[in-house]
Structures are given as C-alpha cells and as structure tokens.
Amino acid sequence: MRKAERARKTNETDIKLSFHIDGEGKADIQTDVPFMTHMLDLFTKHGQFDLSIEAKGDVEIDDHHTTEDIGICLGQALLEALGDKQGIKRYGSSMVPMDEALAQVAIDLSNRPHLEFRAEFPSRKIGTFDTELVHEFLWKFALEARMNLHVIVHYGTNTHHMIEAIFKALGRALDEAALIDPRVKGIPSTKGML
C-alpha cells in the first residue's frame, strides 16, 4: 500500500496529513486557508488520491506559513509513499482547460528537485489568499518530494480559473507519473537508480 503520514508542529503551524497514492479521489481537508483547501480538494479528486489534512496556522499574520508547511508535508508524504519507485512510470504530464484558462504541468519523479513556474496572475489576491503562495506551495512540494516539476499557464484572464487549472493538471500529471506500469521492470532509469 503506497501510503504515508506526516505531522509537523512548529511555532507557526500544526499539521497532520495522510496521503494515499492509489486512492479513490477522497479528500478530507480542513485548513484555515479556504482557497488552499479548495485547490487541494481539486488536486485530490483529479489525481484519484486519498488525502486527509488537518492544518492550523498563524493566519492572523497571513496564509504563508500554513500554505508552505502543507507543501512540505505533502512532498515528504509523497516521497515516502513512492518507496523505491520500482515499476513507476516516472513521467507524467497534463494540460487542463478551465473556461478561458489553460494550464500545463509536467512531472519527473527523478530525485532531482526543481520547479519551473511560468504563470502571471492578473490578481494578486483571491479573497485573502496571496496568489504568490501558489509558487511557494509548489516549490516546497517539489523540493520535499524530490521531483522535477514544470508548471505553465499558457493563458487566462481569471486568476481563480488559472490556479484551478494548475491544481487539476498537477493531480492528473502526478497520477500518471506515480502509476505502476507492469511493463517497467525495476527502476525506470538507465542508470539503475533515481
């Protein structure tokens, strides 16, 4: 069973997270950052993962610490759940439209953490959520999961739609990359290791 749990308690946040790669798209996400909760629901549903999160943070300051620490915990849980990565497809990509917006995500579960982020959002905020935190979340997620993550928003005029397309594409691309392919024997690399 490819599943992992993480807990992180600091002076800024208190997070408990459970992530199951081979799930059914079930989300039980409770955070004090409503927009992030919504995006993680979409990620879970479209990736067919099971994800449970209880997160509290110092949102009276802003949403930064909570959003960042969720990315850290989710990345660590993904890395553990993948195990030795034997038999996985390793690569995944998805292009998702959301009304006028189009986002593309490509992933390599390579143990070479990198984020390439090409998105310019028309609005700096959605409600109280700072849109720059999308980059912060994705960078911490990629770093802790040790994955190469490329995110491009090709176009869009509605910031909510653009970010929603990113999280749906992220779920779909990760589902593909983490999939066990019976044709893959051992580690999916000519080096023999990732």
Swiss-Prot record:
GO cellular component: cytoplasm
The protein's annotated pathway: Amino-acid biosynthesis; L-histidine biosynthesis; L-histidine from 5-phospho-alpha-D-ribose 1-diphosphate: step 6/9
EC number per UniProt: 4.2.1.19
Main location: cytoplasm
Group of enzyme by EC: lyase
Keywords, comma-separated and alphabetical: Amino-acid biosynthesis, Cytoplasm, Histidine biosynthesis, Lyase
Any one GO BP annotation for this protein: L-histidine biosynthetic process
Catalytic activity: D-erythro-1-(imidazol-4-yl)glycerol 3-phosphate = 3-(imidazol-4-yl)-2-oxopropyl phosphate + H2O
GO molecular function: imidazoleglycerol-phosphate dehydratase activity
Keyword Cytoplasm in annotation: yes
Protein localization: Cytoplasm
Homology family: Belongs to the imidazoleglycerol-phosphate dehydratase family.
UniProt protein name: Imidazoleglycerol-phosphate dehydratase
Organism: Bacillus licheniformis (strain ATCC 14580 / DSM 13 / JCM 2505 / CCUG 7422 / NBRC 12200 / NCIMB 9375 / NCTC 10341 / NRRL NRS-1264 / Gibson 46)
